[in-house]
Amino acid sequence: NEAAVDLLPTKEQREYMYHRVREIRGATGGKQIYAMDFQNDGEFVGGCIAGGRNYCHINANGDVEPCVFIHYSSANIKEVSLLEALKQPLFMAYRDHQPFNNNHLRPCPMLENPEILQEMVEQTGAKSTDLQSPETVEHLCGKCADYACQWKETADKLWEEHPYVHKGYSNYKKK
């Protein structure tokens, strides 16, 4: 597969972005604007928003995927309604597992919790929908495992140093 994990930010670069975006927002100086950081702002949206919780992706072929970055599905919008697509087994597994991690600096089932994505795809029978370079979920998650381990230490340190204060939003399935 052509996905280049060496293009992911290092844990040092990601930690820098964590601090820099908050500085830009004005929390510690800078301008009074609200910049978003897709990877590090899980605390503001209650973790991963994908899998139909607040968001899904429909690719050019019509496959309804949990996220623009996660190319697995068992539903196509050309064959089922959006409501039916949101009820596909993979999306139901997302809802059952969310939040994927109580540390919202590690919300993603692919980048920070790849073992969970692999389990969900395998258990639901979802198929690769990558139009350019399909790959097995084992291959994809195997490429993300080192990244997840490296980021975990930094993310846990940041989470402990800066306690989660944005508890007003979660909308998770009741467990």
Tell where the protein language model's regions lie, with residue ranges.
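Radical SAM enzyme [4Fe-4S]-AdoMet core and its adjacent flexible, acidic
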Residues: 1-47, 51, 60-61, 65, ...
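Flexible mid-to-C-terminal extensions adjoining Fe-S/redox cofactors in radical SAM and related proteins
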Residues: 69-175
